[in-house]
């Protein structure tokens, strides 16, 4: 008798995922989230690692004293010192009446600094680097952080308009707050800042006051030059006033003397000779000659001071020209034209 053995159906077994695969999936998700939320920081960190500054630029960076927060941002912008012609291509707008010392391009995340020459302007490159890095920092802030910061910046500016004058009038609404963020950070000591602004800048500079000192140092040289010009101009104006008084007095005395001579000559022709009148006119003529000589000597003295003043103006022109990349290229072209 044949019998059939009935087998029970087998249940399908669920495949268990490997712990390694699970870990990899989680890691991929985490990496994606990290990149989404920190892509700018990652980009800055990676980009900055390949930056190789010149020895001069490295010294400038060290002098400024960036904190770790700002250092990797700064290095990601690859700051570069440039000669006038190259710098003008990167940073100078032909329609802009103001000179530029540096610029930050958010489009390609680069900072360019004009290679200012002259030991008397020590500190200018540090001040410019600080200013431009502050632009890069502001560019990376969230909208919420910018809104709070803008309020603090605006309050400070409104309370200190006399310090800044009409500086901010040249900036569009789009550029306004990033520029305000840079100039306040570049120019204002901590004890003049609100606590919130002081804490903000402290995140990016190891010693904010020491960094501000670079701006104060080179602008003090410019201010001293302007004060010297102003004092020389005041002295020259005073001399000019004295000269005009002397000249008017001499002309009046000369006119009076000539009239007396004419009168004496007419009287002599009429037979009314007077020895006393003649002696008086001779003495008066000597005084007129002495007055003329004194006037001419004062004119010579005045002209010497005019030459000194003009030399100061040229000195000022050359000094401020060192801060204008267009001045250098114009000077070079003029010198070249003179040689042909």
PLM-predicted stretches and their roles:
Residues 1-17:
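N-terminal Lys/Arg-rich, disordered targeting/topogenic segments
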Residues 2, 22, 26, 30-38, ...:
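Metalloprotease/metallohydrolase-associated module, dominated by Zn2+-dependent proteases
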Residues 111-129:
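Short pre-active-site segment immediately N-terminal to the catalytic Zn-binding motif
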Residues 117-121, 134, 153:
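Eukaryotic low-complexity, mixed-charge intrinsically disordered interaction/regulatory segments enriched
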Residues 127-140:
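Active-site recognition of the HExxH zinc-binding catalytic motif
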Residues 151, 279-285:
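Short, charged, amphipathic alpha-helical segments
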Residues 243-280:
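Extended alpha-helical coiled-coil "stalk/arm" regions
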Residues 284-340:
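C-terminal amphipathic alpha-helix
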